[in-house]
Amino acid sequence: MSAETEMLNFDGGFLRRGFWIYVWQVMAPDDRELYYVGRTGDSSSCNAQSPFNRMGQHLGFAKNSNMLRKYLSRHGVEPNGCKFRLVAHGPILDEAENLQTHQERRDRVAGIEKALAEAMGVAGYDVMNTVKCRKALDASMFAEVRDAFALEFPRLQADTG
């Protein structure tokens, strides 16, 4: 194996903690474009990490947090051969100081995560994950999030008809 020089550029805003929605766009070696929709805001603690922190977890080897790696594997894709793009919007809600507020905020963001994953699938993006959530959708917050992502994923444009 020969050494190579790799490069990663990112905006400092990616370091802000709080509740974010994000989309991974993965260009696989076989030219497929795959997508993964996620959020920050733990289900098991009061933490709402930054997208930067979550990025490393997604592609790492810890079984409880490497969901992107798992989905790529299920699609027969080796991450080392891919090109990645992470688009994150947030923080749409601040990190909470107590568990009850954290859970309320997490649930609002989870509803938006599910709606965005479904909207991207309907728009023709090959979304690898199905977000399972029964929480109520905050429609106005979702509209803002969808519009923000539509700037990067144009087929998400709201139906104006």
Q: Which stretches of residues belong to each language-model region?
A:
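Boundary/linker segments flanking structured domains
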Residues: 1-34, 40-161
